[in-house]
């Protein structure tokens, strides 16, 4: 995994933290022939890591800043098997052929999941920080007939202080894995 500090960052554009990327990549169970859609690509952390392990990645974000940040990181890490698009995933999904999906953004999520089901996408991994979004995604996947697994991860980083060491925690992330039955 590439360390978070190596990525170009832009104010207000999120990045999936290194440890969360590692687990999410594991849940995707990537194959070198996979073509992956990254919805809500943010700073491109997942796009870069997925592209290193798959045939091609389509990255989408509704933020122009996120699109630009992802593009910068793709160039920085010499990733050539990824294309970035600005727009709403539900409007762009039909333009691409892919077999796996990573979701880091939840705008219009229920409509997006319905479209993924129509395309018979067998493996989707979604990361959420907002509890209500986790419940919404889990419920929708179950309604659509997916097998759903989810885990909540809390990552803490060590920091040296004058009297010893402390652990500083980041926000917990729910990683949802949906597999078509």
Curated annotation (Swiss-Prot):
Cross-referenced InterPro entries: CbiT, Cbl_synth_MTase_CbiT, Cobalamin_biosynth_MTase, Methyltranfer_dom, SAM-dependent_MTases_sf
Key words of the record: Cobalamin biosynthesis, Methyltransferase, S-adenosyl-L-methionine, Transferase
Lineage: superkingdom: Archaea
Catalytic activity: Co-precorrin-6B + S-adenosyl-L-methionine = Co-precorrin-7 + S-adenosyl-L-homocysteine + CO2
Enzyme class: transferase
Annotated transmembrane regions: none
Enzyme Commission number(s): 2.1.1.196
One GO MF term: cobalt-precorrin-6B C5-methyltransferase activity
One Gene Ontology biological process: anaerobic cobalamin biosynthetic process
UniProt binding sites for S-adenosyl-L-methionine: 16, 40-44, 61, 89
Pathway annotation from the record: Cofactor biosynthesis; adenosylcobalamin biosynthesis; cob(II)yrinate a,c-diamide from sirohydrochlorin (anaerobic route): step 8/10
Keyword Nucleotide-binding: no
Disulfide bond entries: none
PANTHER family given in the database record: COBALT-PRECORRIN-6B C(15)-METHYLTRANSFERASE (DECARBOXYLATING) (PTHR43182), COBALT-PRECORRIN-7 C(5)-METHYLTRANSFERASE (PTHR43182:SF1)
HAMAP family assigned: CbiT (MF_00786)
UniProt similarity note: Belongs to the methyltransferase superfamily. Archaeal-type CbiT family.
Protein's name according to its UniProt entry: Probable cobalt-precorrin-6B C(15)-methyltransferase (decarboxylating)
